[in-house]
């Protein structure tokens, strides 16, 4: 028969209390690790993201739902349930991931309401359009893969990497790098502009495009056989290049005030 002294009984009770609390918290964290919303129609799908300081991965797939996962998000403590921190977005966190998601027509808008830095992964239908807005200067990383529709980016200092996209891509940024690897070039114009930072574009070797490239204090480099600029224009390694690629095609405009522009063949 085991006998416990009063101090040991207190320690034993405390141990079980901690264990129960840990189990409860773990279950709570697992309960809301994923959020889903279905797009009502197969065409005209759009995802609008308003993010603040977090890193975001957008992955396209063959499906009709938006699936969101948050890595590193800590749920609101029980004592704070129903309360909202001052200075936080007035939108309500209805995903339990620090995000507010609303469906209007065939557009899902996701707004980050929590100021905490989290890594979010969003799976979105492959033919959905993406509109991404960075709302603060906290800076994160943005990665987009396999989307076959318009990508619109309004960035402050996030580094953005787009892989296996068709666009068109319309991006404006203050600082940070923008890297795009095109699977093909859409017929609509693509335009990327920066104040400070590099623009790195990869195209299939046979891509037809009409280029307009300009940098104020950087260089333009390429491994494509671009025709030399007309007399009086800057040389290829200089500040401005305009002309056809492989005979011409959709307009591809790349502008940066302070940074380099790279136009390379997809390997």
Give the location of each predicted region:
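Tandem repeat domain/solenoid detector
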Residues: 159, 163, 168, 177, ...
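Hydrophobic lipid-interacting interfaces of membrane-associated proteins
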Residues: 73, 140-142, 158, 176, ...
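Positively charged n-region of N-terminal signal peptides that target proteins for export
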Residues: 1-15
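Short helix-loop boundary/capping segments
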Residues: 161-163, 169-173, 181-193, 207
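Bacterial N-terminal signal peptides
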Residues: 13-24
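Acidic (Asp/Glu) and glycine-rich low-complexity loops/linkers
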Residues: 27-50, 55-137, 143-148, 152-154, ...
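Beta-strand-rich extracellular passenger or scaffold domains
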Residues: 130-133, 141-142, 178-180, 200-202, ...
């Amino acid at each position: 028969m085991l006998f416990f002294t009063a101090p040991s009984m207190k320690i034993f009770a405390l141990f079980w209390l901690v264990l129960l609390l840990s189990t409860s918290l773990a279950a709570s964290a697992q309960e809301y690790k994923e959020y889903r919303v279905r797009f009502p129609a197969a065409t005209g799908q759009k995802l609008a993201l308003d993010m603040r300081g977090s890193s975001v991965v957008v992955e396209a797939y063959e499906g009709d739902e938006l699936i969101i996962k948050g890595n590193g998000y800590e749920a609101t403590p029980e004592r704070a349930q129903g309360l909202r921190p001052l200075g936080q977005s007035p939108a309500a966190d209805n995903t339990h991931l620090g995000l507010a998601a609303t469906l209007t027509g065939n557009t899902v808008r996701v707004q980050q309401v929590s100021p905490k830095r989290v890594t979010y992964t969003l799976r979105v239908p492959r033919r959905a359009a993406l509109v991404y807005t960075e709302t603060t200067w906290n800076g994160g990383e943005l990665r987009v893969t396999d989307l076959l529709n318009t990508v619109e980016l309004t960035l402050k200092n996030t580094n953005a990497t787009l892989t296996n996209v068709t666009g068109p891509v319309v991006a404006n940024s203050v600082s940070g790098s923008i890297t795009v690897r095109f699977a093909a070039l859409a017929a609509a114009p693509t335009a990327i502009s920066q104040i400070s930072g590099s623009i790195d574009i990869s195209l299939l070797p046979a891509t037809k495009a009409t280029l307009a490239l300009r940098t104020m204090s950087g260089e333009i480099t390429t491994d494509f056989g671009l025709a030399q600029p007309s007399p009086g224009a800057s040389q290829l390694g200089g500040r401005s290049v305009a002309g056809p690629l492989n005979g011409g095609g959709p307009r591809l405009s790349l502008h940066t005030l302070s940074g380099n522009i790279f136009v390379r063949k997809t390997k």
